[in-house]
Regions:
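Short, Lys/Arg-rich flexible segments
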Residues: 1-80, 93-144
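Short, His- and charge-rich active-site/binding loops that engage polyanionic ligands
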Residues: 90
Length: 144
């Protein structure tokens, strides 16, 4: 008859479970801090690169965390990507009216030949700035 003592294996299993729970808490804290840093830097970048007219985009930069996932985004702001990446030259035509008019225009017009807009990145630079720090903190937190 062969008898196998698995008590040490059970102890090791409990250790691994405890260790993984501790690591998960550390990782969640690192994610939270990095998401907040990216959000803060993105808002700062918007101000620095002159993208703030009304403050709507700046107020729309938010972070969201669930479990082991964190996102930094501009929710419900349709023009956010256009500020980040710029636009090509395009024609603007009225959707519901016969002509376009804006404050300061001398008269209504049927279309506008928009020259496009230069990219003013704010979110990607904030992410790229934080990434090395995030990876370093993650490496320090998870001891192999």
């Amino acid at each position: 008859m062969i008898k196998i003592d698995s008590s040490e294996l059970d102890k090791f299993s409990v250790y691994l479970k405890t260790k993984s729970e501790e690591d998960e808490k550390k990782i969640k804290k690192i994610l939270k801090n990095s998401a907040m840093t990216i959000q803060k830097d993105a808002i700062s970048n918007l101000t620095k690169n002159g993208s703030v007219k009304t403050g709507h985009l700046r107020r729309g930069v938010a972070n969201f965390r669930r479990g082991m996932t964190a996102t930094v985004h501009t929710s419900n702001i349709k023009y956010a990507v256009m500020v980040e990446k710029g636009t090509k030259a395009h024609i603007i035509k009225p959707k519901n009216k016969k002509a376009l008019y804006w404050k300061g225009a001398s008269h209504p017009v049927k279309k506008v030949n928009h020259p496009g807009s230069k990219a003013k990145p704010y979110l990607i630079p904030a992410f790229e700035k934080e990434t090395p720090y995030f990876l370093k903190k993650l490496e320090e937190a998870i001891e192999w």
